């Protein structure tokens, strides 16, 4: 059962990012629980991005891989970042030059249609942490609080926006996946996180330790 959470829910002085139901690749997900839970369609590859974009600073989020309906394997979960708003042709996170996706099946990361050896595999029940450092252009990825490595990112889009979004999705047309995002409000879906990690910024509650110098993706976090 979930633990108790102090008052970190959205409030007039601090709103936490959710996933954006109006901005999806391939129009292929069902959103619920205030857009903190997404379920992708089994017939389409797709990803979905956060409601808030990041152009400077250091931000952390966690997402739980809740379930998948693949007949075999680990479910083809994908998680990472995208440099611009989703476009329908960009169906897979990492297919383009301006998005990066961590793949559950083999632990690789996908960028510019290339897979690179990276970390461990993951599947249902695992919590993946993303730490995006836009001061140093890096993305660190965690599995259940353990670092899987760091990816160097670049602003490569034509007339680059310099803004990035956290992104959740799947890589495959044979299964559907369910993600639950926690951008700092202290819940995965309807369940409060079971044990709060440390967070030096004091902004947001996460299952595992928020890396030093990072903060939640929220209105307060964007103005630190």
Regions found by a protein language model. Name each.
Residues 1-224:
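PRY/SPRY (B30.2) beta-sandwich protein-interaction domains
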């Amino acid at each position: 059962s979930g633990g108790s959470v102090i008052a970190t829910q959205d409030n007039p002085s601090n709103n936490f990012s959710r996933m954006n139901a109006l901005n999806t690749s391939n129009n292929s997900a069902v959103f619920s629980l205030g857009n903190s839970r997404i379920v992708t369609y089994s017939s389409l590859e797709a990803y979905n991005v956060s409601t808030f974009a990041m152009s400077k600073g250091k931000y952390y989020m966690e997402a739980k891989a809740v379930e998948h309906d693949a007949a075999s394997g680990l479910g083809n979960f994908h998680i990472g970042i995208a440099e611009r708003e989703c476009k329908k042709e960009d169906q897979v996170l990492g297919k383009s030059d301006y998005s990066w996706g961590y793949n559950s099946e083999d632990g690789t990361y996908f960028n510019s249609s290339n897979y690179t050896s990276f970390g461990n595999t993951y599947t249902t029940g695992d919590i993946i942490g993303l730490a995006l450092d836009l001061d140093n252009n890096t993305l660190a990825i965690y599995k259940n609080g353990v670092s899987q490595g760091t990816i160097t990112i670049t602003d490569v889009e034509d007339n680059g926006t310099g803004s990035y979004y956290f992104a959740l999705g799947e890589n495959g047309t044979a299964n559907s996946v369910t993600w639950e995002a926690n951008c700092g409000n202290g819940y995965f879906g309807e369940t409060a996180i079971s044990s709060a990690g440390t967070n030096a910024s004091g902004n947001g509650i996460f299952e595992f330790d928020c890396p030093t110098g990072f903060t939640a993706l929220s209105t307060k976090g964007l103005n630190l």
